From Swiss-Prot:
PANTHER family: PROTEIN, PUTATIVE, EXPRESSED-RELATED, PROTEINASE INHIBITOR. This is Glu S.griseus protease inhibitor. The modification N-acetylserine is found at S1. The keyword Disulfide bond applies. GO terms for molecular function: serine-type endopeptidase inhibitor activity. Competitively inhibits Glu S.griseus protease by forming probably a 1:1 complex. BGIA has no inhibitory activity against 2 other acidic amino acid-specific endopeptidases (S.aureus protease V8 and B.subtilis proteinase), chymotrypsin, trypsin, pancreatic elastase, and papain, although subtilisin Carlsberg was strongly inhibited. The record marks A44, D45 as: Reactive bond. It comes from the Eukaryota. SUPFAM superfamilies: CI-2 family of serine protease inhibitors (SSF54654). Disulfide bonds join C3-C48. It comes from Momordica charantia. The keyword Cell cycle does not apply. Keywords: Acetylation, Disulfide bond, Protease inhibitor, Serine protease inhibitor. Belongs to the protease inhibitor I13 (potato type I serine protease inhibitor) family.
Length: 68
């Protein structure tokens, strides 16, 4: 793939969305982490500069964040 830098953060499952966003953007400055509530509609496009951080209604990371 053409995406550069760290690509996934499985260790962040169970963290708060805000903490996960900070870690992701620190570990790969090329990406912007976007917090999204599980079940929200999102676009299907793939982007190397985006990491979706899927959180529960309580703001806890529910899936391993990854570039996409």
């Amino acid at each position: 793939s053409q995406c550069q830098g760290k690509r996934s953060w499985p260790q962040l499952v169970g963290s708060t969305g805000a903490a996960a966003k900070a870690v992701i953007e620190r570990e790969n400055p090329r990406v912007r982490a976007v917090i999204v509530r599980v079940g929200s509609p999102v676009t299907a496009d793939f982007r190397c500069d985006r990491v979706r951080v899927w959180v529960t209604e309580r703001g806890i990371v529910a899936r391993p964040p990854a570039i996409g």
